[in-house]
Amino acid sequence: MPFPERRRQAVDPARKARKLDRIQAELLAPGLRPVRTADYLNFLPPGTPIEEPALTSGYGYPENIEALVARHRAGWVLDYGAGNRPEYLDNVVNLELAPYPSTDVMSGDMSLPFRDGCFDAIVTLAVLEHVREPWSVARELVRVLKPGGTLIADVPFLQPVHAYPSHFFNMTAEGLKSLFADTCDIESSEVPHYGRPIYTLTWFLQRYCDGLPPEQRAKFSQLRVADLLAHAGEQAKQDYVAQLPKEFNFELASVTTVVARKR
């Protein structure tokens, strides 16, 4: 859980309607005709199943994002892959694949329904690992950003698989920068407080414990850090290694291997 959870509030229908009117008038690419509901503008292809979302997918903004949004109170900020934001903001377009209460626009990954250079800022937090072609999404995000506009993206590096609904790519800092380096000046690259290594350690250890049978879970949870620092090859025959289920090996893998044959 990277950001603090906040109480979610229902969005006033009249307020939502006014915002959707503005989005249609000010931001949409020419010629697009979304399916408009009382809650969002839907650009998904006809027949695309719309599943009831898990309301747990969404957290409040970290302080740097709050400051960015506040600076552009009179403009527009795109939140790409917003999830279910606990605070509904009139200057933030919440784009999602799922109809959360805060969703304004439903759209797929590869082509955004907005005109060129219409957003003052863009944020995408823990999203790009879940898209099949993050490099294509990055190009689209830059396309709809105003010249001189700010884009903030964060992506996991050392995290277990967490599929909402799919998980394709974790990234190093160099990998994340490379998505935008050809079209943007990279002003900073850093590890946020919610991305420090201790979060990796606790998440991996907790999920490792979760995957073990009860007896081995109890044994594993009693190990000291010094025990775990022993060479992995020396621990390979331990029951807490041998009895970890296949799905947890994939979730927490150090390496995965694929064998392919050309059709």
Where are these regions (language model features)?
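Active-site micro-motifs of SAM-dependent methyltransferase domains
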Residues: 111, 129, 159
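Residues lining the SAM
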Residues: 125-128, 154
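GHKL-family ATP-binding catalytic core of two-component histidine kinases
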Residues: 113-115, 132, 172
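S-adenosyl-L-methionine-dependent methyltransferase catalytic module, highlighting the catalytic core
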Residues: 135-136, 140, 150-263
